[in-house]
């Protein structure tokens, strides 16, 4: 019985060895031929046709990937800015309401300014605060004063010059 059971295993080993005979014996895609440049990576050379089927058409984007990435980021930025523009439309409405309140409070300020002492220095400070840094620097340049520094420093220089 043992002989009969060993016989089918021998025949199955022989059929399996037929399929495994051409495969590499060690490592992935290794060959039995000694490489001309030892120590470097072995080159795999495909021995079968790798061209795509006749009906297959491959289209690739010829544009540089960096440029494509930047354009996509720009498009995303524009779409997000469109969303923020929708909220910005609400902003001017609120600002208009704030301006109406400022008009009312400016009348009160004018009445209070005549009552308070030193109000001229406060209005001068407010005038300087409302100016942009560029305008403040232009004014300092006209007077021959240094134009470097923060906005508060620029305002202090203009006040001391006046």
From Swiss-Prot:
Disruption phenotype: Reduced sensitivity to abscisic acid (ABA) in single and doule mutant lot1 car9; this phenotype is rescued by CAR9 overexpression. Increased leaf transpiration leading to lower leaf temperature and reduced drought tolerance. Increased CAR9 transcription but reduced CAR9 protein levels and stability, especially in nucleus, and associated with increased ubiquitination and subsequent degradation by the proteasome. Disrupted recruitment of the ABA receptor PYL6 to the plasma membrane.
Gene responsible for this protein: LOT1
Residues covered by the SAP domain: 128-162
Keywords on record: Abscisic acid signaling pathway, Nucleus, Stress response
Gene3D superfamilies noted in UniProt: SAP domain (1.10.720.30)
Signals that turn on the gene: Induced by dehydration.
SUBUNIT field: Interacts with UBC19. Binds to CAR9 in the nucleus; this interaction is repressed by abscisic acid (ABA) and is sensitive to calcium ion Ca(2+), leading to free CAR9 accumulation at the plasma membrane.
Similarity-based family: Belongs to the DDA1 family.
GO terms under cellular component: nucleus
InterPro entries in UniProt: DDA1-like, DDA1_dom, SAP_dom, SAP_dom_sf
Region described as Disordered: 71-130, 142-162
Name of the featured protein: Protein LOWER TEMPERATURE 1
Classification via SUPFAM superfamilies: SAP domain (SSF68906)
Lineage, highest ranks first: Eukaryota, Viridiplantae, Streptophyta, Embryophyta, Tracheophyta
Function: Supports abscisic acid (ABA) responses and drought tolerance by regulating the dynamic localization and stability (preventing degradation by the proteasome) of CAR proteins (C2-domain ABA-related, e.g. CAR9).
This protein's record includes keyword Magnesium: no
UniProt subcellular location: Nucleus
Protein origin, superkingdom: Eukaryota
Keyword Nucleus: yes
GO terms classed as biological process: abscisic acid-activated signaling pathway; positive regulation of response to water deprivation; regulation of proteasomal ubiquitin-dependent protein catabolic process; response to abscisic acid; response to water deprivation
Pfam families, alphabetized: DDA1 (PF10172), SAP (PF02037)
Annotated source species: Arabidopsis thaliana (Mouse-ear cress)
Record field: compositional bias (Basic and acidic residues): 75-93, 142-156
């Amino acid at each position: 019985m043992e002989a009969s059971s060993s016989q089918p295993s021998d025949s199955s080993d022989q059929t399996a060895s037929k399929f495994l005979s051409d495969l590499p014996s060690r490592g992935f895609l290794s060959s039995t031929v000694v490489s001309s440049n030892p120590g470097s990576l072995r080159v795999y050379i495909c021995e079968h046709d790798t061209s795509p089927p006749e009906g297959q058409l491959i289209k690739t984007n010829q544009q540089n990937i960096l440029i494509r990435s930047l354009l996509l980021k720009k498009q995303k930025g524009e779409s997000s800015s469109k969303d923020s523009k929708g909220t910005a439309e609400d902003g001017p409405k609120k600002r208009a309401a704030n301006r109406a309140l400022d008009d009312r409070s400016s009348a009160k300020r004018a009445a209070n300014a005549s009552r308070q002492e030193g109000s001229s220095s406060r209005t001068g400070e407010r005038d300087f605060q409302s100016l942009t840094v560029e305008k403040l620097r232009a004014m300092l340049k006209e007077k021959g004063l240094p134009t470097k520094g923060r906005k508060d420093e620029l305002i202090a220089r203009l006040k001391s010059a006046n």
